Amino acid sequence: WAYFFGPGCEPGLRELSRVIRRGGAAFVIDNDASRSTFGGWFRRAFPAYDPSEIEAFWSRRGWQRDRLDMGWRFERREDFEAVVRIEFAAELAEQIIAEHDGLEVDYAVNLWWRAK
């Protein structure tokens, strides 16, 4: 497991290319900050994050993308709140908790992949 956040992760991508055998594939799951409720929260947490720039970064390097829709579903509100507090800084987490009713959150991700 590794984190690749677009520009700046080139050394990690080189290492990934090195260890993937011929005929293999590499996969990266990335938040799709251009859509979904979670994507909006992500943009609030990281205002300098430009989804278009990140998509161009991966595409220029030959990665293919599948856009996936997933979600969070909780049985208890306390569990939702605990996860939000893990994912976001305290002030934003409290804003999200106050603004979002319910036990479900739509969450979009990009599945980036490249065959070797």
Q: What are the language-model segments listed below?
A:
Residues W1-E10:
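A short SAM/SAH-binding and catalytic strip from SAM-dependent methyltransferases
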Residues E10-R22:
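A short glycine-rich, Lys/Arg-flanked "PGG" loop and its adjoining helix->strand segment in the class I
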Residues F57-S59, Q64-K116:
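Conserved Class I S-adenosyl-L-methionine
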Residues R22-G23, K116:
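Short loop segments at secondary-structure junctions
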Residues A25-A56:
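Conserved class I S-adenosyl-L-methionine
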